[in-house]
Amino acid sequence: MKQVYIIGMGPGSRKCLTQQASEAIEHADVIIGSKRLLEAYSNTDKKLFYAVTARDIYDIINKEKALIYAVLMSGDTGFYSGTKKLTEQLYKAQEESGEKKYDINILPGISSVIYLASKIGQPWEMAAMVSLHGKKQNYIPLVLTNEWTYFLTQGDVSHICKRLCESGLGGADIWIGENLSYDNEKILSGHVSEYSEYTAAGLTVMAVNNHYPQAAVMTGLPDESFIRADIPMTKREIRASVVSRLSPAKDAIVYDIGAGTGSVSVELAMHALYGTVYAVERTKEGCELIAQNARKFGLDNIDIINASAADVIDKLPAADSVFIGGSGGELEKIMDIVLKKNPGVHIVITAVTLETLNDSVRLMEDKKVDVIDIVQIAVTQIKKRGRYHMLAANNPVFIIEGRGNR
C-alpha cells in the first residue's frame, strides 16, 4: 500500500511548517507540488515532480513504484486547496479497483490569511473570505456586509481597491501582505483609497476592515434605490414577494426574463452571490439601466443579455429558478425551454392582465408543473397632497408560482 501525505505548506517559508509536516516530507520517497513549493527541496536526493492538478498528481502516484509520497499544497489543506479534488480522485480509484491502494494522510498548514491576521493582531473567525486565485468572485457585497474581509489575490490589488472605492468603501481600513513568511515580506496599511493605483507582488493577501457593515441581505429595496428612466420597473412590494418566493441558493443559476431596469435581478443576485443571474431584456435602454444598477450595488454576478428570451435561453446553463416578468408573447416557448433544461425548475410569473394570468395557469397545468400558489397583490400608497393624505392605488398584480416535476 502506498502512503500519501497531503501537506499544507503554509504561506511559503519552511519555517512555518509543522513538525509533523517536516517529518512526512523527510520520510517521503517522492515530492510532488508546484514549482514555487518544490524550490525549497531542489537540493534533495528525492524524486521531484511538478504537478498541480488532481489528475496529474494522481497519475504520478499511480505510475511510480515508490511507497511514500509527499504532495505539497500551498497554505492550508482545507482552505481553497486542491486537497478535496485529489482525495476524491484517490478514493475513486480505490473504489474502482476494489482494493485499498492508498493510505491517505492530510496534514494541515498555516493559511496565509491566518498568518496575516496574526501579524496585524486581528481575529478572523467571523471574517468573510474571498479567493481570486484563477476565478471570479462577487466580493463587493461581502465587504459591504461584513466587518472583516480577507482576500487571497493574484496581485490585482489596485483593481480591487478601485472597485471598493466605487462602492463607497474608500475609507475602509486595509492591510496588504506581500511575500508573507519570506525574507522580503512586506505588510502595508492605510485606507482603501490610498491603494487604488498600487502595484502589488503576485502573492498578496489583503484584509479589509469595514467599520459600518450593512445588513446581510435585503429584500424589498426602496424603489428610489434604483436608477430609473421610462422603463417599467417591478415595484418594491411585488419584488419582495417574487424574490422571497424564489429564494435562490447562494450558488443558484437564475433567469430574470423581461428584466426591465434590473431591480429584480439585483435582489436575486444579492441572494445568489456565488451563482449567476441572467438578466434577459429586449430593449437596449433596459440593458443599460440593468448595467448601471448592477454597478451601483457592486454586483458582478449579473449577466446581461440584450435579446428576446425565447431566442437565447436555450444556450444558457440550466436554471434553478426563473422569474418571468415579461415574455413578449412567447410564454409557452420560454416555459418549454426552461422545463426541458431543468424539469424541476422553480418558476414565478407576474401578470397584470387576466389573459396572462389565464395563460400562465393553463400552461403550468398542461406541462405538469405543480402550481404552488396564485395570489393577487393590490398596493395602495398614501401620498400627501397639500393638507390632505390621498390614496394612490397601483395596478393589481397577479403572482403565479410553480415548480416542475423531475
Language-model segments: what does each one mean?
Residues 1-105, 114, 274-277, 281, ...:
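Class I S-adenosyl-L-methionine
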Residues 2-6, 19-20, 51, 69, ...:
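A contiguous loop/helix-start segment that scaffolds small-molecule binding in enzyme catalytic cores
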Residues 12-13, 19, 75-145, 310-311, ...:
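Class I SAM-dependent methyltransferase SAM-binding "motif I" and its flanking Rossmann-like core
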Residues 251-260:
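Conserved class I S-adenosyl-L-methionine
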Residues 261-273:
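Conserved SAM-binding loop of SAM-dependent methyltransferases across substrates and taxa
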Residues 270-277, 341-343:
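Conserved S-adenosyl-L-methionine
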Residues 290-291:
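Conserved SAM-binding loop
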Residues 339-393:
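C-terminal substrate-binding/active-site "lid" region of AdoMet-derived donor-dependent transferases
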